[in-house]
């Protein structure tokens, strides 16, 4: 088992772009890694927290890990939580786990440009401030 964990952690992250999410939505399990306080606006088709738990448990107990690929996404491109979750799922033996690296921020920006039909969300992102989903500034604290 130790070698499996080492193997899972040594593999480079499998990443995808927004076009894969658009094309594969509904065919894959879409899971977010946002904190519970930020679950009000999600990419349409995202499993809610209870569904996610049930889905992962069914994979682990029924050994059906090849049945449905998983797409993970976080808040934005700097969010490391999807990669942490990917490593966790890989270490459990779930192999088809992909990270949409642009995250919710990129999705909402695309929705703002191309419309909700192409980039649907659970609440139509009725927020006036898309920048609340942007990455935090890092270099301003360094220099």
Annotated model-derived regions:
Residues 33-35, 51, 75-76:
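Structural motif
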């Amino acid at each position: 088992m130790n070698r499996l964990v080492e193997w899972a952690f040594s593999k480079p992250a499998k990443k995808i772009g927004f076009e894969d999410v658009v094309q594969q939505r509904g065919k894959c399990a879409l899971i977010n890694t946002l904190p519970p306080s930020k679950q009000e606006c999600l990419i349409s088709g995202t499993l809610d927290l209870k569904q996610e738990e049930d889905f992962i448990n069914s994979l682990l107990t029924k050994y059906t890990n090849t049945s449905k690929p998983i797409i993970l996404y976080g808040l934005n491109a700097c969010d490391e939580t999807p990669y942490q979750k990917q490593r966790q799922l890989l270490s459990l033996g779930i192999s088809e786990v992909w990270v949409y690296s642009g995250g919710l921020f990129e999705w909402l920006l695309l929705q703002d440009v191309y419309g909700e039909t192409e980039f649907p969300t659970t609440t139509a992102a009725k927020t006036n401030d898309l920048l609340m989903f942007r990455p935090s500034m890092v270099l301003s604290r360094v220099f």
